A protein has these predicted regions:
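Cysteine endopeptidase catalytic domains of the caspase/legumain-like
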Residues: 147-152
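Acidic donor-binding loop at a coil-to-helix junction in glycosyltransferase catalytic cores
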Residues: 159
């Protein structure tokens, strides 16, 4: 059996609507290594359904031909099935993305939601909701100091995966315990044991001196 290290990967999906405007179809996916900040995979996806390219996508320069000529959902799915078993996938909104692409949870080693993790710490408390309100990716990215490259824009899979990876890393930094100075490492119970040992050694030395037979000269 060959083992491989577990990798933490930020993932983002983008969508188009079908021509009946009744459901979302995945049209783009990007995966980015959280530790190395390296893009692992990104592609447009040819939706299974007849689809509509929204004005927002057209403004980003994405055309219907871009999606028609992209790999099919079946081709991408086969690749991800072989790629994901050693990946812990980190979504911004895991519930939404897994609703539209549930196979990701089955293929991956595990899944995490960055939006929930961030919002539980920084989201304003909503008394009607009974929990912290969810924070938008753009707002969380701005708050944590994420800086986009000139070619980046939100609601592109590569940009959103990059922002998600950055935020997760920042949360990890905050979660690490502060370094402990060496003079604090000695716990009270260890100190007591050492002190008792020192007293025992002194007592043994004293007893040895009292029982010593003096030399005749």
């Amino acid at each position: 059996m060959v083992t491989v290290p577990l990798r933490w990967i930020a993932i983002d999906l983008e969508y188009v609507r079908d021509e009946m405007n009744s459901k979302f179809c995945v049209c783009e996916i990007a995966l980015r290594c959280i530790e190395s900040n390296e893009e692992i995979y990104r592609t447009y996806i040819q939706p299974n359904e007849n689809f509509l390219v929204s004005r927002r996508l057209r403004q980003k320069g994405i055309t219907e031909d871009d999606l028609r000529q992209a790999p099919t959902m079946e081709e991408v799915d086969r690749l991800l099935k072989s790629l994901l078993p050693s990946f812990m996938l980190v979504f911004w909104n895991a519930e939404n993305d897994l609703k539209h692409y549930p196979n990701l949870k089955a293929y991956a080693y595990g899944t995490r939601c960055c939006m929930k993790r961030y919002s539980e710490r920084y989201g304003p408390y909503n008394y009607d909701f009974g929990d912290h309100s969810f924070i938008k990716l753009e707002d969380a990215a701005d708050a944590t100091g994420f800086i986009m490259d000139p070619e980046d824009s939100y609601h592109q899979a590569s940009t959103d995966a990059k922002a998600c990876a950055f935020i997760w890393n920042e949360l990890n930094k905050e979660s690490l315990p502060a370094s402990i100075s060496l003079d604090l490492v000695l716990r009270d119970d260890v100190h007591d044991l050492l002190e008792a040992r020192e007293k025992t050694l002194k007592l043994e030395d004293k007893t040895s001196d009292e029982n010593e037979i003096p030399l005749p000269f």
